[in-house]
Each structure stands twice: as C-alpha cells, then as structure tokens.
Amino acid sequence: MDWNRVEGNWKQFKGNVKEKWGKLTDDDLDVIEGRRDQLEGKLQERYGYAKDQVRKDVDDWFTTLK
C-alpha cells in the first residue's frame, strides 16, 4: 500500500489516527486531509516530537495498515 490510499480514503483512517494520537483535534484532522506532511507537522506541534521521531512513528503506524 502507498500513502495515496490513506490520502484518498482519509475519512476511513481518521478514527485510527485519532485513536493512535489522541491529542490531535477534529480540526487538526480536517486540516491534515490525509497529507503525510500535514500529519507529521501536527504531530510535532501537539506532541513536541522531533522530525525524525515523527517520521518513525508515522512509518510504524502506516505499516500496521498493510
């Protein structure tokens, strides 16, 4: 699976993202709209993660979707 599937079906993945990263608000999820760069940016903002940590966390989450 590639990220385009997440972006194209964002409404289906929003609940999973909210469950994994509960500090993200519904407004955050609407802004993200399935875009990986937006997701990573919001995670950095809400959790104070470094860019490398965010990328690893998103990669780990993404692999669970396959």
Curated annotation (Swiss-Prot):
User: Which named protein is this?
Assistant: UPF0337 protein RPA4217
Species of the source: Rhodopseudomonas palustris (strain ATCC BAA-98 / CGA009)
Say which family it is in: Belongs to the UPF0337 (CsbD) family.
Pfam families membership? CsbD
Q: Which Gene3D superfamilies match?
A: YjbJ (1.10.1470.10)
Top-level lineage group: Bacteria
